[in-house]
Amino acid sequence: EEMMNDLARAMTARKTPPARDVPPEVADDAKWVRADLVAEVNFTEFTADGVIRHGSFLGLRHDKDATQVTVEEPQEEPQRADDSKVGGVQISNANRKVFPDAGCTKGDVARHYERVGPRMIDLMGHRPLSLFRCPSGIDGQCFFQKHDSGGMPDALSRVSIEESDGDAADYLYATRPDSLIAAAQMGSIEYHIWGARVDRLDRPDRLVFDLDPDEGLDWPDVRAAAFEVRNALTALGLQSGAIVTGGKGVHVWLALRRTRGWETVKLFSKTFAHVMAAQNPDRYVATMSKAKRKGRIFIDWLRNERGATAIAPYSLRARPGAPVAVPVTWEELEKLDSANGFRMGDMAAQLDQPCPAMAVQNDLQALTDGVIEKLQTWSEG
């Protein structure tokens, strides 16, 4: 209040306007003042007309003369001692520990996505994303983000998608490796992807079964389940691949020709999972119920509906040890002793080998009438 009174006294009204030809509708209510006071104002930017946008008055500057005031030019933010550039992207607080137990920093996360970025984009590019962000590290507050709520880097692309309530929202997607690095700069650790690309959101091209074990089950049970799912798909005429998720489970997945819509893909995967559970009720369940999952593996088919996501190949997981979701061959899977054995530091060796997921992605398959008929016959048997 004291500041406002001070300001009112300082702004002595003129009797006549300082400009000619002032419109009456303006002049009637205007109070004219001399331009000899200097105010400090916080604001976001100048508009194209030179007007301050989102201005906030901070106080008068009695130490400055009005004749000394000039328009400020934007200045680059000074680089901090712990900042660095990765893949052309400025990474702030690069030394901040993101995985404290593993000693991995924010800069390490960015460098991981620089290394695996080209391969990731080949597999997940142009798909709507859900980012799992941990700005203060995995021990701090973490959250999912799928919409562009403002402040996200330009390296991430946007696509407007109609949601279930009929409203449209801008979703994020990556088109190049620095998209992933830029998201890492914003604290993103995990990248989860849709089963369709932005140019045909109504036509899924990826089908995933996420094998999610109950707490009491051991890795050999999960590994055996992955092979059983693979064999059942093979019996239907479908070839599949495996991704160890960096958590407890395995994704058995295949690439689809874009000939079917979401309803068909969802119904196929639901029927498949329920048949597996019906034929092996002591080992599998096809519902999310925690009570029914006791001692069993949930064959999660729900990844195959519009808007659902699955962890992207080569994405980090926000878990102790900095594990990575890694595609493997069936021969490699047979020799693994866990689903989270790959770490950030193992990626150089992985990148020296051909990518198993690329072989799966290039083997486009279709849910033909013949495949669906085989599934129907199997379900009735």
Q: Which residue ranges define each predicted feature?
A:
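Nucleic-acid 5′ end/cap handling module spanning
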Residues: 1-8, 55-60, 220, 243, ...
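Long, well-ordered alpha-helical scaffolding segments within enzyme catalytic domains
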Residues: 2-12, 112, 219-238, 265-280
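C-terminal accessory nucleic-acid interaction domains of nucleic acid-metabolism proteins
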Residues: 12, 16, 22-111, 121, ...
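Core structural elements
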Residues: 86, 246-248
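Charge-rich, low-complexity segments
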Residues: 90-175, 179-184
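Short beta-strand
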Residues: 132-134, 240-246, 287-291
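Signature for HUH/AEP ssDNA processing cores
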Residues: 172-246, 256-264, 379
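A short beta-strand motif that forms the metal-chelation/ATP-contact edge
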Residues: 251-257, 298-301
